[in-house]
């Protein structure tokens, strides 16, 4: 006979189990949402990276001495110390979260093969001649490099050489696999994202029409294709050919990709056309539709100048003349003329996009912003005190300041004009290829000239200053409106939109001078306008009725020591701003510009550290900045 205590215990256990089962079956939908962070995909983190970096696999980088491997490029980006091509130890102040190595697709890998004297190079007499020049070094190597580049520019390279390094060849396929496999090796979802990409380097007649291509996908899809080139017979310099390549990639692989351009400032007006294209085509409905689809992002700042605005186009903006390159096109074969500027700068392109959308139904210049280095040293360095130059030939030395980047009979891009810039901040919920790509595509990004300040920008109809005091302002931002890159639609009322913006300094950089909102709009008569508003300023300065502060923040830079102090400016700024000039019948865009207090440029560090003798024209001090992607308002 069973013990009564055992029976009782078993019975009690059964009752409890049944009760627990009943309770479990009564779990409601509200219960399932108890944990506030479960299933949350709100972008709470900003991930920093360089979307434009070259290794020695790029023709120009390799010819001018870049021997730093693609693997070392990733190691530096991830925080390791490596040596530059000249043997100088280099390390980033902080690791990056992601990187896109974008080697030029044209003649990819040829420079290293010529220098190494591979069998296929030695079999072609002219290529063997170049190899011998590099082998001798010094003047002979320089002459070989310029002779090769000259033949490339004039399209007079040996046909067999072009064939060897074009899509479909064994050599081209080998180099592409090297690039893809390196990205696969260094990609660690959640820790570091290594995108697969390349640069399509269209430069007809010296007009810079370059685009970088980024793939969302892994090697299994990337290796089903080969990059598009610009050299005939397989390549093309027409962006329409690139759009077709992207279309084919997505159709044939099931993957996703997009392109983004850079350095409109070196295109002599052809980067953002409004009527005709350089190739003789027209800016018609097909063109604007394709460009809107395939180019959702723009590299607004980098080593070859800042591309936000120009004082000729924005004469009332005292911050527009920042790191401006104004001499000519990329090879200075044609001088710059004022009428070209309209097709070169991002702010003007945003404005022209509103007009084209009204005319043709699509806005081809509806892009988000990012920054990049475009370094050809394999070194993704963007800090003023850690500047390793555009190419290996201008790595740190006291004389590099005097070496022009490009020169011709028409002028020169002087060495001191190079810019230690920039990086892209991406708002995403995790550090993976998919999450970062999607954020770039939806334009939830911002570009900086190097510093990693935190910037949030939301637009809606009901923000108030109390929203900034919430324990999670971003949650309120998403709930009541749209983030940077988003769209506001026309309301029935005449209520003006409000914008919640806040910025925090980079903890390793300078305090903030101000936050500005830049607005562009298309009025009812078809005219374009722009206006700059100071919306939050440091040090208790006053913003007057015109929306501007008349008092400068000051300058603490010591020119003798290349130092500054954070005794001016604020560590963070925030506000909720309502457009005082809003008309619901006028389409518009808004973006923020966050400006630091003055700090030394890299040339001043060269003077203090290396004893460089600076030209009197060299700017010693600048105000670094961030540009948020715009928020658009449609009056349709």
Feature annotation, model-predicted:
Residues 214-216:
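Long, charge-dense tracts
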Residues 25-70, 74-131, 165-168, 178-190, ...:
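C-terminal functional module detector
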Residues 78, 136-141, 231-236:
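Aromatic/His-enriched, Gly/Pro-containing loop or helix-boundary segments
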Residues 1-23:
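Gram-negative bacterial Sec-dependent N-terminal signal peptides
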Residues 125-162:
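Aromatic- and acidic-residue-enriched carbohydrate-binding clefts of CAZyme catalytic domains
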């Amino acid at each position: 006979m069973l013990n009564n205590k055992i029976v009782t215990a078993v019975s009690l256990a059964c009752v409890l189990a049944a009760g627990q089962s009943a309770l479990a079956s009564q779990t409601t939908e509200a219960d399932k949402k108890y944990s506030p962070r479960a299933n949350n995909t709100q972008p709470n983190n900003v991930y920093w990276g360089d979307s434009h970096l070259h290794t020695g696999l790029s023709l120009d980088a390799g010819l001018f001495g870049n021997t730093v491997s693609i693997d070392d490029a990733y190691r530096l980006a991830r925080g390791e110390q490596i040596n530059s091509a000249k043997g100088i130890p280099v390390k980033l102040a902080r690791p990056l979260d992601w990187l896109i190595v974008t080697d030029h697709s044209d003649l990819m890998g040829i420079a290293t093969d010529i220098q190494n004297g591979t069998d296929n190079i030695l079999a072609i007499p002219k290529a063997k001649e170049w190899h011998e020049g590099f082998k001798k070094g010094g003047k002979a190597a320089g002459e070989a490099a310029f002779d090769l580049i000259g033949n490339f520019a004039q399209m007079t390279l040996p046909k067999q050489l072009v064939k060897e390094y074009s899509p479909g060849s064994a050599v081209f396929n080998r180099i592409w696999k090297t690039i893809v496999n390196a990205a696969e090796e260094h990609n660690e979802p959640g820790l570091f994202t290594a995108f697969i990409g390349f640069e399509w380097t269209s430069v007809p007649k010296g007009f810079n029409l370059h685009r970088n291509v980024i793939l969302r996908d892994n090697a299994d899809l990337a290796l089903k294709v080969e990059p598009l080139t610009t050299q005939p017979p397989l390549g093309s310099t027409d962006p329409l050919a690139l759009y077709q390549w992207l279309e084919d990639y997505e159709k044939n692989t099931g993957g996703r990709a997009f392109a983004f351009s850079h350095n409109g400032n070196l295109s002599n007006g052809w980067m953002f056309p409004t009527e005709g294209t350089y190739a003789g085509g027209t800016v018609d409905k097909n063109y604007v539709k394709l460009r809107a689809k395939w180019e959702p992002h723009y590299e607004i700042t980098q080593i070859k100048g800042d591309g936000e605005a120009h004082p000729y186009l924005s004469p009332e903006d005292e911050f527009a003349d920042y790191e401006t390159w104004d001499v000519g096109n990329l090879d200075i074969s044609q001088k710059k003329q004022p009428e070209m500027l309209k097709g070169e700068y991002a702010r003007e392109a945003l404005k022209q996009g509103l007009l084209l959308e009204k005319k043709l139904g699509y806005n081809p210049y509806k892009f988000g912003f990012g920054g990049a280095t475009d370094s050809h040293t394999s070194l993704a360095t963007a800090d003023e005190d850690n500047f390793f130059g555009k190419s290996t030939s201008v790595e740190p030395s006291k004389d590099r300041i005097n070496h022009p980047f490009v020169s011709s009979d028409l002028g020169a891009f002087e060495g001191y004009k190079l810019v230690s810039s920039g990086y892209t901040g991406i708002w995403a919920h995790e550090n993976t290829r998919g999450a970062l790509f999607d954020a770039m595509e939806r334009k939830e990004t911002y570009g900086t000239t190097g510093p990693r300040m935190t910037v949030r920008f939301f637009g809606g109809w009901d923000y108030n200053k109390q929203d900034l005091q919430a324990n999670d302002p971003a949650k309120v931002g998403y709930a009541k409106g749209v983030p940077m890159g988003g769209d506001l639609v026309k309301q029935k009322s005449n209520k003006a939109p409000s914008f919640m913006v806040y910025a925090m300094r980079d903890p390793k950089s300078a305090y903030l001078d101000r936050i500005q909102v830049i607005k562009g709009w298309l009025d009812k008569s078809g005219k374009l306008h722009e206006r700059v508003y100071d919306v939050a300023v440091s040090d208790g300065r006053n913003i007057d009725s015109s929306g501007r502060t008349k008092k400068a923040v000051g300058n603490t830079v010591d020119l003798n020591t290349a130092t500054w102090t954070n005794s001016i400016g604020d560590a963070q700024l925030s506000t909720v701003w309502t457009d005082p000039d809003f008309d619901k019948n006028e389409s518009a865009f808004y973006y923020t510009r966050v400006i630091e207090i003055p700090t030394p440029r890299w040339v001043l560090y060269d003077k203090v550290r290396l004893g460089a003798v600076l030209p009197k024209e060299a700017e010693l001090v600048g105000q670094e900045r961030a540009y948020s992607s715009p928020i658009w308002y449609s009056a349709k």
